[in-house]
Amino acid sequence: MAEEEEAKTEANGQQQAPQMRVLGQFIRDMSFENIMAQKGAPSDAQPDVQVQVNLDAKKRTADNQYESAIKLNVTSKVKDGDATLFVLELDYVGIFHVDNVPDEQLHPFLLIECPRMIFPFLRRIVSDITRDGGFPPLNLENIDFLSLYRNELARRQSSEAPKMDA
């Protein structure tokens, strides 16, 4: 019965709703450096945590399959100094099967919706790694992937804009 409705929808020329399935997710690359332990210094200092997020997506060889990656760099320094407490670099990837997304909407879909699906798992990994590294668990705030995407588009457009000579 559902197949008949899909056939009717296609026959009427209406577009089907976008569909996405997570086929897998994995850590492509990870590095955690506990600088304080290497230096033998006490880790009771007040931390200043800086988080950088980069996104990447690419098509896989299979039909309608894509990779969406969140690249996270976390640096924690002593609040009142230059000493680094720890550095965490994590490249977390999701593999997705995507159907019924128009080509002009595919790029934002892969860089907004797909990262949104895998982010809770990345957050847990970051929390576990920092805790296991001897620090309080770092609980990342939610990331607004739409704003991140828009900011990146604006940055690219401003860097491509012709410069005016005064």
Swiss-Prot record:
Compartments where found: Cytoplasm
Organism of provenance: Roseobacter denitrificans (strain ATCC 33942 / OCh 114) (Erythrobacter sp. (strain OCh 114))
Gene this chain is encoded by: secB
Coiled coil: none
MF terms in GO: unfolded protein binding
Biological process (GO), any one: protein tetramerization
A single cellular component GO annotation: cytoplasm
Function, as annotated: One of the proteins required for the normal export of preproteins out of the cell cytoplasm. It is a molecular chaperone that binds to a subset of precursor proteins, maintaining them in a translocation-competent state. It also specifically binds to its receptor SecA.
PANTHER family noted in UniProt: PROTEIN-EXPORT PROTEIN SECB, PTHR36918
UniProt-recorded name of the protein: Protein-export protein SecB
Pfam families cross-referenced by the UniProt entry: SecB
Subunit structure: Homotetramer, a dimer of dimers. One homotetramer interacts with 1 SecA dimer.
